[in-house]
Structure formats: structure tokens, C-alpha cells
A protein has these predicted regions:
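N-terminal Sec-pathway targeting helices
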Residues: 2-23
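Acidic, glycine-rich catalytic/binding loops that coordinate metals and/or anionic ligands
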Residues: 60, 148-149, 154, 161, ...
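Short, charged helix-to-loop "capping" segments that act as catalytic/coupling loops
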Residues: 94-106, 141-150, 164-178, 186-192
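Zn2+-dependent peptidoglycan hydrolase active-site motif and core
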Residues: 106-148, 173, 177-178
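A generic structural motif
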Residues: 119, 141, 165, 197-201
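Short hydrophobic beta/alpha edge segments that flank linear recognition/processing sites
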Residues: 124-127, 154-170
Length: 206
């Protein structure tokens, strides 16, 4: 009788011990995961700060000359819904909606790494700054002379005129108001990611 009682006690104690051990393992595992998450969040925050500093350092000039600044409007439309995905830039609109009227200049020093027609972007130029960040100018009506892949450009250099090209085969225009679509992209490993240009445009204008 007493032996069975002791056996039952031993079994209960063993089960309790296993439960406590399992709880301890779960708590340690959760703490490790939380620690990793906090560390990862800290790394991401640091990377964002570094990217912000890089872009601020890259941008020297507003992409529209000062003489035409009062003749454009823009707002933060980054992330707005589009037919294909979301808007990955900021649109600077010509208040007179006239094709080829307002010149577009490079906001950074850099090298032309893309030029030509895109179905959605129309006539566009992509300029990669020395930092590696990519600056994208789309819907141009035409290019400045000598613009080609490999050309070195300086901030403030004329690269083309604002237009309404795109959303069709080469030469398509007029499907939307005349504007410059200005985009900023950076490499995150093998992925190219967009950045909201709006706050940087505001900062350039300060």
C-alpha cells in the first residue's frame, strides 16, 4: 500500500518536473527569438538611417530649374494605387500642362545607366549616383543632346523636357497630364527597392 503511494508520488513529481522543464525551454526559446527580433529591428533602423544620409548627400539640386519652380505642383503620392502595383515615385506636374515646356535637370552627380522607352514610363533616363543609388526620371517629351548610357552628368545638368509619354508603344503621349515622375531606388541584396522621394524634394527646396 505504501509502496504504491510512493510510486504515484514519484510519477506526479516526474510529470511536474517535465512540465517545468518544458516551460523553461519555451521561455528561453522565446527570449532568444525576441532578442533576435530586437537586434534585427535595430539593424534595419541603422540601415534606414544610413540610406537616408546617403540620399541627402546625393541630392544637390531640385529636378526642375529654379526659374520654373513656381510653375509646377507636387504632392506625396508615393504608394498610391496604380493599374500595375503602387506608385513608386513623386509626380511633379506642369501647371500649364504643355508638352516639352519645362526643362528637367539631374538632381545628382552620376552616370546615365538607362535611357530610352518604357511601356509605362515613356521616355525615361536613369542616373546612378556614385553612392550606387538610382534616380529615375520618366515621361519625358525629349532628351537633352548627348544623353546616352555611360555619359557622366553633374547635378543641375539639363537632361530633358517634361512630357506626357508612356502607357503604350513608343511615342504614345497625352494619356495623362504633363509631369515628371521622379523615383529613387536602392539595392537591398538582390532586390531593388523604392524610396519615397517626396520628403527629399521638400528638403532640397528648403
Amino acid at each position: 500500500m505504501h509502496t504504491h503511494y510512493k510510486d504515484r508520488n514519484s510519477t506526479v513529481i516526474g510529470v511536474i518536473f517535465l512540465i517545468l522543464l518544458l516551460q523553461a525551454v519555451i521561455i528561453v526559446s522565446l527570449n532568444v527569438k525576441i532578442g533576435r527580433s530586437v537586434h534585427h529591428a535595430g539593424e534595419v533602423k541603422q540601415q534606414e538611417k544610413q540610406l537616408n544620409r546617403t540620399i541627402i548627400s546625393d541630392l544637390h539640386t531640385f529636378p526642375v530649374p529654379a526659374a520654373f519652380r513656381s510653375e509646377i505642383t507636387y504632392e506625396d503620392s508615393y504608394g498610391a494605387g496604380r493599374i500595375q502595383g503602387s506608385h513608386e515615385g513623386c509626380d511633379l506636374l506642369d501647371t500649364q500642362n504643355t508638352e516639352g515646356r519645362i526643362p528637367v535637370v539631374s538632381a545628382t552627380d552620376g552616370e546615365v545607366t538607362n535611357i530610352g522607352w518604357l511601356y509605362l514610363g515613356g521616355y525615361r533616363i536613369g542616373i546612378t549616383a556614385p553612392s550606387g543609388v538610382y534616380y529615375y526620371y520618366a515621361h519625358l517629351s525629349s532628351y537633352a543632346g548627348g544623353m546616352e548610357v555611360g555619359k557622366k552628368v553633374q547635378a543641375g545638368e539639363w537632361i530633358g523636357f517634361m512630357g506626357s509619354t508612356g502607357e503604350g508603344e513608343e511615342g504614345t503621349k497625352g494619356k495623362f497630364p504633363v509631369h515628371l515622375h521622379f523615383g529613387i531606388y536602392y539595392q537591398d541584396g538582390t532586390d531593388e527597392k523604392a524610396v519615397d522621394p517626396y520628403p527629399y524634394l521638400l528638403k532640397i527646396e528648403e
